[in-house]
Amino acid sequence: MTALILKRVAQAIPVMLIVAILTFLLMKLLPGDPAILIAGDGASPETVERIRVELGLDQPTVVQLGQWLWNLFHFDLGRSFLLSQPVSQAIAERLPVTISLALLAFAITIPVGIIMGVVAAYLRDSWFDMGVMSLALLGVSVPSFWLAILAVILFSVTLGWFPSAGYVPFLDSPLGWLRSLILPASILALFQIGYLARMTRSEMLEVMDQDYIRTARSKGVSEYSVLSTHAFRNALVSVLTVSGYIFSLLIGGSVVIEQIFALPGLGRLLVQAILARDLPVVQGTMLFLGFLFVAINVLVDILYTIADPRVHYD
């Protein structure tokens, strides 16, 4: 197992390097000059040029990329143009909000999605089964921002059940933390519940058609034991892999949700940095999210192998 972990980590290193290089090059394609942004609209050309020299923007792209990778190797993501603080500090301050939102949405998605998928498989071709498939289609076709706006209008503005914006830290008030996140987390989870339910249903149907399931039923094993002990346990391996992918999607989907609900997380930080052309923050945030996705995939691969020792990665 140790060899597997070391192998997966070693395979992830070049992927992370590619993510870092692509992040830097994509930022070069953004319009606007950071030096002009820092200097202000009324700054003289001499002032703008001086700032460009100080930031190293006058250097060739290859030199800037080398400096960026060197700083990254020393865990230096640079300094924000507008926040006047290190990018790593800005990310660290907002990371708990994004992780809290994603974890709460994940805690909603996994049990609800799995239960719906299992029941839909058991009640194949029933109204409940068709409802689950409709929910999965809804998650693919309906934009998250549109549903989030409707939820704010209904549950916050009209009914007043939940706050429409803002975030309460967990240590300040656990109940306030839950009230500030339950609505955005539910909207974020809704789009993944249908996907997980459909995947669970598909895996359950495939397992339930196997010979050993029919053998268990012929021996008089209760239907509950057939579903929970035999069918679900074997279908769980594939569901585990999808769960890691879903958590990555929840973190990525938080960008839109945080913006609508004014949550001070990484997604909102990224959007504000893009609008303000704060390139160090954009680079650092995108790079951190990319590394986080890679780390999640590595962890899922390891858990997948633990859950099913028959699986081997070349």
UniProtKB/Swiss-Prot annotation:
Membrane topology field: Multi-pass membrane protein
GO function term, MF aspect, one: dipeptide transmembrane transporter activity
Cleavable signal peptide: none
Keyword Transmembrane helix included in the entry's annotation: yes
Keyword entries, A-Z: Cell inner membrane, Cell membrane, Membrane, Transmembrane, Transmembrane helix, Transport
Family: Belongs to the binding-protein-dependent transport system permease family.
Protein name (database record): Putative peptide transport system permease protein BRA1092/BS1330_II1084
